[in-house]
Amino acid sequence: MQQDNRKKNNLEMEFFSDYGDANRFKVQEVIGKGSYGVVCSAIDTLTGEKVAIKKIHDIFEHISDAARILREIKLLRLLRHPDIVEIKHIMLPPSRREFKDIYVVFELMESDLHQVIKANDDLTREHYQFFLYQLLRALKYIHTANVYHRDLKPKNILANANCKLKICDFGLARVAFNDTPTTIFWTDYVATRWYRAPELCGSFYSKYTPAIDIWSIGCIFAEVLMGKPLFPGKNVVHQLDLMTDLLGTPSLDTISRVRNEKARRYLTSMRKKPPIPFAQKFPNADPLSLKLLERLLAFDPKDRPTAEEALADPYFKGLAKVEREPSCQPITKMEFEFERRKVTKEDIRELISREILEYHPQLLKDHMNGADKASFLYPSAVDQFRRQFAHLEENSGKTGPVAPLERKHASLPRSTVIHSTAVARGGQPKLMNNTNTLNPETTQNIPFNHATIQAQQRNLSAAKPSTFMGPVAPFDNGRISRDAYDPRSFIRSTNLPFSQQSAATVAMGKQQERRTTMEPEKQARQISQYNRYAPDVAINIDNNPFIMARTGMNKAENISDRIIIDTNLLQATAGIGVAAAAAAAAPGGSAHRKVGAVRYGMSKMY
């Protein structure tokens, strides 16, 4: 017995030293708490990148909560887009068949749109335009995958000080399939009433379309313009009153499409109300933005534009090029087969385990080959990580900074771990050549009024201490121009295991080490193996127009060089304005990225 235990311990240690990865992250501080978990900021010691780690505890206590977690991590794996929050990693649990908690690693975002609206009373028209552009671009991508978010609100939109927005919280999202009924029972639809489309008011049994998300985006944009919610209804009746006060009484034909009988009767008996002109409701807004907002907030869902149609609106002229905005292949029914049958906790546990393996390519390969050792335990680093979270949770409310616990035995487990990236520990990822970035030579030839910039620099004042947002980031042909020193890369999702993607593609936001060439026979075998995993996915994605790679690192070796690059990008921007360019050229760093104090920490759970 003792020999068997010793052998088991040796196997566990060997297994964990190969695949365990909790020691990869150094926990910093608690940045958010909720009923189902806690979020801490951390440092990825492999890349030096700041991340947010969300601990979700007791995920199998209620099967509905477990299904929601599975749905979200699955959708965030499939929906890879720069305007959607990215899961970078999911840690291996101590036991694949007995775990209760999971640790999900996200890219770190500094705040959310709700806090941005509260803290900034000096947002410009460029901010408003850029915010709506990002939200519609993300929504176009989501809807082309046949996914409806269903819970869009400012707290579910993460934000950075460089004006970057990312949609998060897909726990209430649903995937629509063409051969299945579009009518569902909305028992779990508890989205905030203020952003809920009128056709859903008081309705729990309804057909849903992408128009419900479009309405939510309209409410969010109006809140950005006003600085407060547009329809803060206290109940369903009050909500309908607020809507009709602004939009006027809907036609009888429109009322007939409201599913709830009581709401339908109330609207029918309502006195005739004329609509209020949006120019009167939003006196300082761009007239073009108000014309688009009227379309987004059409009472009848048939009159609302799609996200793609909204991006083609004149409001985004010179900013968005609809044909270049990313789209997504529709999600297959097999991915969400669990939604259409009765599942047990063990079924959900197995499906979540399978999702976790997507972030551990070697284990995934073993699992697909039937050689995975599911009964092995790997306790050391995960247990230490759990203690770090508990320590920070217990002390987060006390005065003064809380120092995270350090490892007492740094040698266990060893640092030779396998990750979802080919970057060596302590090394830097190699760069890709990006053929879609701005040409510095053409940038230098753009007419630029330096006298105006100097005058603007003299008039620049320090940001207020409570201000969060800096000037709007630059663009390149309708896409966000990424900083030359930004280490992130993005690619639309595929279902291929990371270890089997082409060496020149980007996997989970990281670059592979180098390109390899394959002989025809080997390539045929590789394609056959691809088809086993994802027969409908194109193999060669080298020319994917949605890849956004880091570029220009060799040209930006110091702070001044970075400022020059950012200023050149601003010079090439049409419609962003001289003030933003002045901020970029101002002394003291790349001012267009951050102005004023950034509030570190957030109440929003990822």
From Swiss-Prot:
How its function is modulated: the record gives: Activated by threonine and tyrosine phosphorylation.
- Gene giving rise to this polypeptide: MPK20
Q: Does the keyword Acetylation apply?
A: no
For this protein, the record's Pfam families field holds:
Pkinase (PF00069)
InterPro entries for this protein: Kinase-like_dom_sf (IPR011009), MAP_kinase (IPR050117), MAP_kinase_CS (IPR003527), Prot_kinase_dom (IPR000719), Protein_kinase_ATP_BS (IPR017441)
Q: Which residues carry this modification: Phosphothreonine?
A: T187, T192
Q: Which GO terms describe its molecular function?
A: ATP binding; MAP kinase activity; protein serine kinase activity
Stated name of the protein = Mitogen-activated protein kinase 20
